Design a protein with these regions (language model features):
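Aromatic-capped, Gly/Pro-kinked transmembrane alpha-helices
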Residues: 486-509, 526-602
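Hydrophobic transmembrane alpha-helices and their helix-loop junctions in integral membrane proteins
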Residues: 106-155, 165-454, 458
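Hard-cation-handling environments
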Residues: 459-515
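Transmembrane helix-loop-helix hairpins at membrane boundaries of multipass inner-membrane proteins
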Residues: 1-134, 209-219, 247, 278, ...
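Alpha-helical transmembrane segments and their membrane-interface junctions
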Residues: 148-159, 395-410, 471-494, 563-566, ...
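Alpha-helical transmembrane segments
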Residues: 1-14, 60-70, 101, 134-141, ...
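Hydrophobic alpha-helical transmembrane segments
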Residues: 94-100, 225-237, 424-431, 501-521
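Membrane-helix interface motif
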Residues: 15-23, 71-81, 202-212, 397-411, ...
Length: 602
C-alpha cells in the first residue's frame, strides 16, 4: 500500500506541475530550522555506528568536521542569507520524482517476495525486513526532498540522509564483507559531504546566498564561482561513483538485489548526477567543467572496458552503471544545450532498463543459485518469461532503436559541436566495448540446452508484477521518446538556457519510435499459420538432430556447451581500475591545483 501511494502521489505531482516552474520560499521558518535538527540526528546515527558499534573512529571524525562546519555557518550567517527560491519544481525535478517514485515503488513491491525468499535461503542472516523496508522508504523520501531543494542547505540535509540509508542497506546482512563495504560507501560519501559543506560555506560567506539557481546565475554572469562549482562536482563524483570513488558502488553488490537496484536506478547515484546536471549551464568554459568532462569521459571508457572481463552478472551491471554515469557527467561538463539534453535522456533510459536488469539477475540468482553469466545457459528453456525480461533490459541498454543508443548518438553530436575530439574518441571506443559484454550475455541466455526444467514456479506475483511492468516501461519509454523530449526535457532546457531547438530531428525520433513498435508487433505476428522450415545447427561434430548434442570422433554423444571469452589478459579488472583511478585522480588534482592556485580564473 505504501509503494502504491508513493507511485500515485508521484504521478499526481508530475501531471499537476508538468510544464511549469514552481518556486516556494520558506525563509527562516520553523521548517528551515528543522533541517538543522535533522543534520544533528543523522550525525548521531553515524556516531552510533562508527563509535559505539563498530569503532571506526576516523569515519566519525569526517562526520564531526562537516557537521561542525555547517552548524558554525548556520550560526554566523543567521539573518544574512537571501532565502529566495528554497524549493523549485521544474520538469527535470518532476522527471526525477517519477524515477524515484515509480521505479522505487516497483522495487519495493518486488522486495516483498524477494526478501521473504532471501531470509529462508540465508537462515544465518538476522531477519530485519521491517528495518529494511523502513530504510527503503526513508531513502525514497530523502530523494524527493533532495530533488526539489534549491537551497543547498536543504539539499545537504537530504544528501546526508541518502548516504546513511545506503550505508544501512548495504550492511543489511551484517556479515564482515557487508559491514566493510557499507563503511566504504559511508566514508566515501562523507568525503563528498565535506566538499558539499565547504561549497555551502564559501558561497554563503561570499555571496550571502545558498540557492543553487543563484550559483548558476552567478557563473553565467561571469562571477568567480569556480571553486564552489569544483567542490560541488567533487561531491557529485563521490555520490555518482566516478573513478576513483567507484569502489563503494562495486562493494554494494553484497547487499540484497533490491538494494542494488535502488542504488543503481532510482536513488543514490542519480542524486549525484542530478546535482551535476543542475550545474550544467555553469560548466563548459571553466576548469570545473573541464574536470567534469574528463573525469566522466575516463570513467565511461575504463568502466566499460572493465565490464568485458566480468562474468558475475551484478558486477557487469555495476560497471555498466558506472560507465553510463560517467557519460552523463561528461555531457554535463560540456555545459551545452545539446549535452544537457543528452544527459537527462540517458538518466531516464538508464533508470528503467537498469532496474529491470538488476531485478532479473536477482530473480535468476534465487532460482538457479548463481548470478554467474556462465551459469545462464538454457535460461530460455528454464525461465522463458524471465529470459524475455532480461532480453528487453539488455536491448534497452545497447541496441538500436532503443533509447540508450539514440542518446549516445546525441552525445556524439554534442561532443563534435563542442569541439572535443578526445572526448569523442572515449565515447566511440567506450560505446564499442559495450557490445562485448552485452552480446555475450544475450548469447548465453538465448542458448537452448538439454535437461532444463522450468523453474519459474517459485517467483511470486509481486516479483512478476515489478518485472513485467518495468519491461513494458522500457519499451514504452523508447516509443514515447519524441514526446518525452518535446514535453518533458525541452521545456526545462528552454527555461534554463533561454532558447529551444531539436537536438535530434523530430522526424528521426519518430522513425526510431516506429521501429520499436515494429520490433514488438512483427515477432508476434510473423509466421503464424505458416509451415516452418527447420535447419539443424552447425556443431563441432555430427548433429544428433536436436541441436543440443553432437557425435564426436569416437562416435560418442557430447552435449553442446557454450563458453565466453572474457579477455582478462587485455581488459582485466585490476588493470582497468588502476588506469582509470590514476587518470581521474590526476585530472582532479590538476584542476583543483589550477583553481585553488589561481593560475587561471574559471
Amino acid at each position: 500500500m505504501s509503494a502504491a501511494a508513493i507511485a500515485m502521489l508521484s504521478l499526481f505531482v508530475a501531471f499537476t506541475y508538468f510544464g511549469n516552474k514552481v518556486v516556494f520560499r520558506l525563509g527562516d521558518s520553523f521548517l528551515a530550522q528543522g533541517a538543522i535538527l535533522v543534520d544533528i540526528l543523522v550525525a548521531l546515527a553515524v556516531f552510533y555506528y562508527t563509535c559505539v558499534r563498530f569503532h571506526r573512529y576516523w569515519i566519525a571524525l569526517l562526520e564531526a568536521i562537516q557537521l561542525g562546519a555547517v552548524l558554525w555557518f548556520e550560526y554566523v550567517s543567521h539573518g544574512t542569507l537571501d532565502y529566495y527560491a528554497d524549493i523549485v519544481v521544474d520538469n527535470f525535478t518532476l522527471i526525477m520524482i517519477l524515477i524515484a517514485g515509480v521505479i522505487g515503488s516497483l522495487i519495493a513491491v518486488f522486495s516483498l517476495g524477494y526478501m521473504e525468499a532471501f531470509q529462508k535461503e540465508h537462515r544465518d542472516v538476522r531477519d530485519r525486513r521491517n528495518f529494511f523496508f523502513f530504510v527503503l522508504f526513508l531513502f525514497l523520501s530523502a530523494m524527493f526532498g533532495l530533488v526539489v531543494s534549491n537551497n543547498l542547505l536543504y539539499m545537504y540535509t537530504f544528501w546526508e540522509i541518502t548516504s546513511v540509508c545506503s550505508f544501512l542497506l548495504i550492511g543489511y546482512t551484517e556479515s564482515r564483507v557487508a559491514v566493510n563495504n557499507s563503511f566504504k560507501a559511508l566514508w566515501m560519501n562523507l568525503l563528498g559531504g565535506a566538499a558539499f559543506a565547504a561549497a555551502i560555506i564559501v558561497m554563503g560567506l561570499t555571496y550571502h546566498s545558498t540557492a543553487l539557481s543563484h550559483l548558476v546565475g552567478l557563473a553565467l554572469a561571469g562571477m568567480p564561482v569556480t571553486v564552489i562549482l569544483a567542490l560541488l562536482l567533487l561531491c557529485g563524483f563521490t555520490k555518482s561513483a566516478m573513478m576513483p570513488f567507484s569502489g563503494w558502488l562495486l562493494g554494494a553488490m553484497v547487499a540484497p538485489t533490491p538494494t542494488s537496484a535502488l542504488l543503481h536506478s532510482s536513488t543514490m547515484v542519480k542524486a549525484g548526477v542530478f546535482l551535476i546536471i543542475k550545474l550544467c549551464p555553469a560548466l563548459g568554459n571553466n576548469h570545473a567543467g573541464t574536470m567534469a568532462m574528463f573525469v566522466g569521459g575516463i570513467t565511461f571508457f575504463f568502466a566499460s572496458c572493465a565490464a568485458i572481463s566480468q562474468s558475475d552478472g551484478k558486477k557487469v551491471l555495476a560497471y555498466s552503471t558506472i560507465s553510463n554515469l560517467g557519460l552523463i557527467v561528461c555531457c554535463a561538463g560540456i555545459g551545452s544545450y545539446e549535452a544537457a539534453w543528452t544527459a537527462i535522456m540517458i538518466v531516464i533510459f538508464h533508470a528503467v532498463a537498469k532496474s529491470l536488469l538488476f531485478l532479473s539477475v536477482g530473480t535468476a540468482e534465487q532460482q538457479l543459485g548463481s548470478r554467474d553469466i556462465e551459469r545462464f545457459d538454457g535460461l530460455f528453456n528454464a525461465m522463458p518469461h524471465l529470459c524475455l525480461c532480461m532480453v528487453i533490459g539488455i536491448s534497452g541498454m545497447f541496441l538500436a532503436p532503443f533509447g540508450m543508443l539514440i542518446s549516445k548518438w546525441a552525445a556524439m553530436k554534442a561532443f563534435i559541436d563542442a569541439g572535443h575530439p578526445m572526448l569523442l574518441l572515449l565515447l566511440v571506443f567506450g560505446s564499442a566495448t559495450t557490445i562485448f559484454y552485452w552480446a555475450k550475455w544475450l548469447g548465453k541466455i538465448l542458448s537452448v540446452m538439454n535437461g532444463q526444467e522450468r523453474r519459474e514456479q517459485g517467483i511470486t506475483q509481486g516479483e512478476w508484477f515489478a518485472l513485467k511492468t518495468l519491461s513494458w516501461m522500457t519499451i514504452i519509454v523508447c516509443i514515447l521518446f519524441p514526446l518525452i523530449s518535446s514535453y518533458g526535457v525541452l521545456p526545462y532546457l528552454r527555461i534554463t538556457y533561454g532558447f529551444t531547438r531539436d537536438v535530434i530531428a523530430q522526424s528521426n525520433l519518430i522513425i526510431m519510435s516506429l521501429m520499436v513498435v515494429l520490433l514488438v508487433i512483427l515477432p508476434s505476428r510473423y509466421g503464424k499459420g505458416q509451415p516452418k522450415r527447420k535447419v539443424g545447427a552447425l556443431l563441432a561434430g555430427v548433429n544428433t538432430g536436436d541441436d543440443r548434442n553432437y557425435r564426436g570422433a569416437g562416435d560418442n554423444i557430447i552435449p553442446v556447451e557454450l563458453r565466453n571469452w572474457y579477455m582478462e589478459e587485455w581488459f582485466g579488472e585490476k588493470k582497468m581500475k588502476l588506469s582509470g583511478f590514476a587518470l581521474c585522480m590526476a585530472c582532479i588534482f590538476i584542476q583543483f591545483a589550477i583553481i585553488l592556485g589561481g593560475v587561471y580564473r574559471g
